[in-house]
Amino acid sequence: FSDIYFLAMQDLYKDFTESVKQSQNIFNMTGKVLPVTLEEIQICAELEDGTVIKSKDKIPEVINDKTSNISRIYITPSNCKPAPGVLEAIQEADAIIIGPGSLYTNVIPNLLVKGVAKAIKESKAFKVYVSNLMTEPGQTDNYTLSEHIKAINEHVGKGVIEYCIYDTGEIIPEYIRKYNMEGSELVEQDTSKVKVEGVYLIQRKLSHIENGFIRHNPD
C-alpha cells in the first residue's frame, strides 16, 4: 500500500518532499517524516548463482523461479546522498528503531544510502531491531532470526543494531497454516546465534491477529 500511495501522492504534488508533508497532514502524524533520500535509486540484487536483478519488484519473482538465494543487495547510484535533515535526525535521536519490514527491499536499502549506517553507528541512541514475525517468500525463505541480523551486519557492518526485540506470543496454528500455504513460516528464534552477532535480546509479546492476518501489535 505505502509504495502505491506515495507514487500517487508524488504524481499529484509533483514533488516527493511535498507529498510526504501533505501525507503527514492527512494522517495527522506527530513528529517528522523524512525520506532517506530524494534521489532516484534502483534496488538491485545479486543471487548466489551470479544472477543480477535490477528491479525491486522482480526480486521475489526471479528468486522463486531460480531457487537461488540473495547474496547481496545494492543500490544504484551507490553514492546517493541522504535527504536534508536525515543525518541530523539520526544524531539527535534518543532511539533508532529498525524494522519490521522486508529485509532486502526495505530495511537494508535504507541503510545503504551514503552516510546513514555510519551515522547510526556513531549515534548514542538506543538502537533496536524489531524482528519480523514471518519469513517472506522470495526474500527470506527459511531465514532464522540470527540470519536476518547477520544479513544486515554483512551489508553495513556491526554496530547499527544493539538490541533485538523478538516475539514470545502464542499464535493459533490455523493462522500459521494459512501463511505456510503461501510459502511463509514463523521466523525461528535461534537466540544463541543472535548473541554471537553481538546483539542483546529483549522478549516481548509482539504478535496479534488483525482481520485474519498475523501482525505486530502496535501497542
Label every PLM stretch briefly:
Residues F1-D15, G101-T105, M134-T140, I171, ...:
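Glycine-rich phosphate/diphosphate-binding loops and the adjacent beta-loop-alpha structural elements
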Residues K56-K58, V62-Y74, N110-M134, S184-R204:
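P-loop/Walker A phosphate-binding loop and immediately adjacent motor/lid segment at beta-alpha junctions
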Residues F1-K66:
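Electropositive, gly/pro-rich neighborhoods at or near active sites that engage anionic ligands
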Residues E39-P100:
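Active-site gating loop/helix substructures
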Residues N142-D219:
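C-terminal functional extensions of proteins
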Residues T67-I70, L103, V107-V160, I171, ...:
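Conserved phosphate- and dinucleotide-binding cores of soluble alpha/beta proteins
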